[in-house]
Structures are given as C-alpha cells and as structure tokens.
Amino acid sequence: MTTPSTPARRGGPVAPPGWSRWLVPPAALSIHLSIGQAYAWSVFKPALESGLDLTGTQSALPFQLAIVMLGLSAAFGGTLVERNGPRWAMTVSLLCFSSGFLISALGAATSQYWLIVLGYGFVGGIGLGIGYISPVSTLMKWFPDRPGMATGIAIMGFGGGALIASPWSAAMLDSFGSDSRGIALAFLVHGLAYAVFMSLGVLLIRTPAARVKDEESGESARVPVTGHGVSARSALRTPQFWCLWVVLCMNVTAGIGILEKAAPMISDFFAGTDTPVSVAAAAGFVALLSAANMAGRIGWSSTSDLIGRKNIYRVYLGVGAVMYLLISQFGDASKPLFILCALVLLSFYGGGFATIPAYLKDLFGTYQVGAIHGRLLTAWSTAGVLGPLIVNQIADRQAAAGHSGPELYGLSLTVMTGLLVVGFIANELVRPVHPRHHVTPPDAAPAAPVPAHKEAAAHDDAR
C-alpha cells in the first residue's frame, strides 16, 4: 500500500501530509513558461532567412513541425502521462525541449538547416506536447474546487512564454549577431537555460493524495468520477467532437498565422511610412501579443463560466472575423488600430485554448475528458501547418510578383476571415451528445444531486 509520503506506484510521487497545493502552480508554470517559447519563433525568422538564405516559408518549417508534433505527442502520449505521472512527463518534456535547442545549435553552427528542423521541430515538438498536457491534468486534480482557475493557470503560462522569450531572444541576437554563429549561440543558451528552469518544476511537482482539502468548506473531500460520461473512443464517433475539432482548428489557424509572422508582418505593414518599426519594436510587439494571448486564456475562459461556452466561441469567431477585416482594410493607416486588432485576435486565440477543456467537459463529462482533449489537439497540429503555410506562401508569392508592404498579407488576412466564419458555423452546429454514447465509468460513485438551474444552464451551454 502506498502512503502519502512515498512515491506512488503509478502516477508519480504523492505529496506528503502538509504539502501545500500552492507549490504546484509554480511547478506547472516553470514548464509552460518554458515551452511557450514556441510563440516567439518569429523573432528568429529574419535572422534565419538572412543567415541561412531561407525563404519565409522555409524559416517557418521548424515551428510548423513543432506544432504538429505537439498535437501528435499529446494525442498519443496522454495514456503514458496518466500512467507514469507528471514528474515523468515533465522530465521527458525537459529532455526533448532542451535537446531540441542543442541539436538546432549544431545545425546553425554547421549551416545544416535540416538539423534545426529535426531538433526544434521534431524533438522539441515532442517536448511541447508532453509538457503541455502534464500540468493541466495535475492541476485539475489538485484544485477540484477551482478547476477553471487551475486550467487557466497552466494554459496561461504557455501563452505567456513568449512574453519572456521574445525580448530575451532579440537581445541575444543583437549581442551574438544574426549570422549562423550568432544563431547557434542563441540556441545553445536557450537550451541550457530552459533545462535549468524546467528542472524546478520536475523537483516541485507532486500528485495529490486521495483527498484534497476544499479551502472554502474546510473539509477534505474525495472527488470521484460520477454519473455518466463519454469514452474517448465513443467521442470520436460523435458529430460534436468533430464540430469542436473544426472550431478549434479554425480559431487556432487564424491566430497562429499572425503570431508566427508577427515580427516581420508589423515591420512590412509600416515599412513605407514615416514611422517604420525597428527590430526591437517588432520584438516588443511579439511580447505584447504574448501578453494578450496569456490574458485571454484566463480572462475569456473565466467569462465563459458566466455566458456559456457556445456564446464565448461566438465572440472568438465572430468578432475575430471583424478584426481581420479591419486589419486587411485599414491596418496600414493606423498603427494603434493594427496593434489593437492584433491584440484582440491573440486574446481570442488564447481564450479558445483555455475554454476548450470546459467545453469538452460540458459535452462529454469528466470521464476520459483528458484523453478526449489530447485527441482534439490534433486540430492544433493541423492548424500549425495551415496558418503559417497560408500566410508565408501568399507573402512569398506576392513578394515574387513585386509587391511589398501590406500587399503581402491582404489575401491571407481575407482567407483567415473566411476560416473564422467556417468555425462560427461549426460552433452553431454543436448540440448535446445523444445518450446512446453515455457510459457509466466502472469506478463511478453515485452522482450528487445537481440543482435544477445549474443542470439547465449546463444543457443550454451545448445548444
């Protein structure tokens, strides 16, 4: 029998008596703030393109592959994470993410771009996926009385990673140089620094004992799986899963397209004006987008508790389409308008990620919702290819045709508007899951009575 002070046989080390659950959010943040560096990849794009003679499409490839591997490793590694626990998952994330930078450093030093793609994109991408899902699940277990806040904390950290990485990466490139040697040194420092920072999370993380104290009631309560739910396998057979897949894919495609190209995009939009954007200012813009991304994850997901998941996605997708139209039509006329619209879009992008677990819970219940979430993240993998591909391919073709400035992005912004409309329609098609898909978990406890007004509200959220 495992005691609270000894490592659990499955699921990793269990917290000893008296262990504060408030030590767990910093552990989760140390992982998510590190792997959130992926959102600052656009800072490296100009240096890679000039130092290694790459096109915009080529310089986006490591980022695209990293997002693909994030979704795939999250989808297929979820069972391993649950079986081996958060410390194992965080260790794997640390090793893969840091090694990815070290391999990329070797690739930059030897001008072998395929090593950068392999290191950052493939190896580092596995670290992204395993690291992304491990703190979310653990925090939900530690905070059964505040699951929305717990999810927001973890996913907010991922969104805020570039807030630190963007100016830090830009400063290193300024110091080391933007040639292949400077890029290699920057990658090397990133790999070593993130290894140290992520190790703090590995050391701090613990899984909760069987009972977690509810701070509001002061009582210790077990939180079992109750009532009916939908298994991960059955969820794949429902139209609701695929509607949400389209919703997430469209929302992420629209956000990730502008995020991956953020630094060069704002520079190109105002290159021909009296107030061009410097490299440092462009990096600052990326940091602002990361702040909006981070704030949206906790702000909009909390708002969804008040107005419902379906309504909040109506905001993400409907208002987001309007923001893209404003940028495409008037973005080059006003720098504040461009920045404001981009910030709103990135807040919706982050909010979409943070709200989707609750949306899944509303539709499919808590039984195997983590596995369902992991499978849904394949939409992120798809979007990680679509978004940058659309923006970069169109920009490259426009540049080859002799266009410059905002003309490089007009068509891609219009495409993003259309994708958000598709996502809006998919969200409108979401309905409650048919009872034939429900199963009773083998370890389920009798469900507590649900007040009628709350039951009706939860049902309405899926309408």
Regions found by a protein language model. Name each.
Residues 191-220, 423-431:
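C-terminal membrane-cytosol helix-exit motif in multi-pass small-molecule transporters
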Residues 95-109, 319-332:
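C-terminal ends and interior cores of transmembrane alpha-helices
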Residues 41-46, 166, 233-300, 387-392:
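Extracytoplasmic gate region of multi-pass secondary transporters
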Residues 48, 129-143, 150-151, 351-364:
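Intracellular juxtamembrane helix-capping segments at the cytosolic ends
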Residues 64-79, 287-299:
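Central cavity-lining transmembrane alpha-helices of secondary-active solute carriers
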Residues 248-257, 281-356:
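C-terminal transmembrane helical hairpin of 12-TM major facilitator-type secondary transporters
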Residues 146-167, 374-388:
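Glycine-rich segments within core transmembrane alpha-helices of 12-TM secondary carriers
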Residues 158-209:
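Helix-loop-helix hairpin linking two adjacent transmembrane segments in secondary transporters
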